[in-house]
């Protein structure tokens, strides 16, 4: 029994469930944690350096909203549905805004910010991200068009860390933990 399964079992027992129910919950938690990513999965994406989750700034629904990191909450704005765009390649659809993310045009700087944008109806036009599992279990998430990687950088004036795309340098700021989550458990 791995640590995650034990933790799920302990939490379930503390919440007053029966041993059978607790075992079932622990098994489902372990299954979700160890499974490969698939289209239609709902996930939260945590940056390894900062420990926070990917979301649109201030949970704003507007196109052009910067993508930032925020402390973990069971909120729809921090949860993404994986839409198939090829082998280990996905378009991310936010559960709260129903929009996706894409790098801003290169004219916005050397490491363009990642911003929220409307989800194109034509799948071929949807921004795609390649998820590459690393030896430590985290993921490198790269823009399919440029190959540049989602990277967290400190926010201006002490604000939330901002998300940009940058060449891969194997830094913690470029590594992401992807955890499946049941969207029925989300609030807001």
Which residues fall in each region the model found?
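Bacterial N-terminal signal peptides that target proteins for export
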Residues: 1-8
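Lectin-like carbohydrate-binding module/patch detector with strong preference for beta-trefoil
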Residues: 23-188
């Amino acid at each position: 029994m791995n640590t995650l399964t034990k933790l799920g079992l302990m939490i379930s027992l503390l919440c007053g469930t029966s041993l059978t129910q607790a075992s079932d919950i622990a098994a489902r938690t372990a299954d979700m944690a160890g499974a490969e990513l698939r289209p239609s999965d709902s996930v939260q994406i945590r940056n390894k350096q900062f420990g926070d989750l990917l979301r649109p700034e201030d949970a704003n629904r507007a196109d052009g909203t910067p993508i930032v990191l925020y402390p973990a909450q069971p909120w729809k704005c921090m949860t993404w549905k994986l839409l198939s765009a090829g082998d280990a390649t996905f378009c991310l659809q936010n559960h709260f805004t129903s929009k996706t993310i894409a790098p801003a045009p290169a004219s916005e700087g050397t490491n363009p910010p990642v911003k929220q944008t409307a989800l194109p109806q034509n799948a071929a036009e949807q921004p795609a991200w390649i998820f590459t599992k690393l030896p430590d279990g985290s993921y490198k998430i790269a823009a399919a068009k440029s190959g540049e990687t989602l990277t967290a950088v400190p926010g201006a004036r002490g604000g939330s860390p901002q998300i940009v795309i940058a060449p891969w340098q194997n830094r913690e700021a470029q590594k992401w933990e992807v955890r499946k989550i049941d969207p029925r458990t989300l609030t807001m």
